[in-house]
Amino acid sequence: MADNKPELQRGLEARHIELIALGGTIGVGLFMGAASTLKWAGPSVLLAYIIAGLFVFFIMRSMGEMLFLEPVTGSFAVYAHRYMSPFFGYLTAWSYWFMWMAVGISEITAIGVYVQFWFPEMAQWIPALIAVALVALANLAAVRLYGEIEFWFAMIKVTTIIVMIVIGLGVIFFGFGNGGQSIGFSNLTEHGGFFAGGWKGFLTALCIVVASYQGVELIGITAGEAKNPQVTLRSAVGKVLWRILIFYVGAIFVIVTIFPWNEIGSNGSPFVLTFAKIGITAAAGIINFVVLTAALSGCNSGMYSCGRMLYALAKNRQLPAAMAKVSRHGVPVAGVAVSIAILLIGSCLNYIIPNPQRVFVYVYSASVLPGMVPWFVILISQLRFRRAHKAAIASHPFRSILFPWANYVTMAFLICVLIGMYFNEDTRMSLFVGIIFMLAVTAIYKVFGLNRHGKAHKLEE
């Protein structure tokens, strides 16, 4: 008898996938957190974004090579299951789920703060609760509708960044808003020099900058729902990282060139100041709206990922089969519902803890180490993937470059970043939280004998 159970649907086009990845990566960290890294490194933070982007490029090309031959939902978690061991597939899926849950809770916390800009008397838990409801509705819709919602969410902040870069270049080269006098590049070398924070400040900022790229691998999560995945995913992998790199580096370049780096953050958001520079008096309200949608977009992308990770775990028999339930619209409804429920519980922190900054910092920082696990897994899995696909690799149109040396050097770089996090007081606790979480899920794996549950399944053809 044929199995007519609903399955995930391939309803995502290239533009949806690209904007889902952009939406998940470019979050409130760029709009609100630029001042932190500049405080440590000064203008050299530009170099930190470029270096981190280079290594993330190698990671993405490795993932793209595997996605072309095996476009499955769960992506790197499934590859870990197949090419490393069921345990690493399990650990990867839970680590990525935990990362996005932490990011999601921090994003809805931020939403409460942004709404108070217009309604200062409103309790922050109210807009946080409304945000959870909106994200739930978007993620329980058919995947194509979800893709459209996230496309427009992400488009708002992408457009804002582009406009900000264009305005900034006008100020730098043509003196817009500066009496016609071009500002030039003096702010990059004055006020302590390009490496104003020294090498220690640069390396400290580099650790945080690496974390800002987390989310770019969301492309892999969409693989099982992409139309014509070989073409769509190849295009998305090739475009997304370059766009993110341009947006990050372009925005930071404009900010540190227009304003002295040691004044950024003391007079408000650098994005607000850039728009205000050319006389846009409503700049604060505009940017507040943009960061509000940025937070919604980041949370929306995160819940999409969380639902698919729980689905992948259930398919690999590492969660109850009920978690693999798919609605008639092709949505992994059980995984999404559980993730939304925990997000709802997390939103209660906004009621319990009145200081939103404490909630945001504690929760967001806890996501960094679990978010790096998929990167290590992608690089290691590809080493074994190559051996399993020798014949196909010879004619592969999207092979990664500098293999295998790029894999080894990138892993060494990520290890150095983790070591740097330990020696930085601002990030040490987040490292410990990540380690505790990974030890906890490992203990559950052993205690419940999840290693006895079958071998990997091919989720999607």
Curated annotation (Swiss-Prot):
Periplasmic side: 38-39, 118-122, 177-200, 265-277, 354-359, 422-429
Alphabetized UniProt keyword annotations: Amino-acid transport, Cell inner membrane, Cell membrane, Membrane, Transmembrane, Transmembrane helix, Transport
GO biological process: L-serine transport; threonine transport
PANTHER family xrefs: GABA PERMEASE (PTHR43495), TRANSPORT PROTEIN YIFK-RELATED (PTHR43495:SF7)
Family: Belongs to the amino acid-polyamine-organocation (APC) superfamily.
Described purpose of this protein according to its UniProt entry: Permease that mediates the proton-dependent threonine and serine uptake. Shows higher specificity for threonine. Cannot transport homoserine.
Name of the protein this chain belongs to: Threonine/serine transporter ThrP
Source species of the chain: Escherichia coli (strain K12)
Gene: thrP
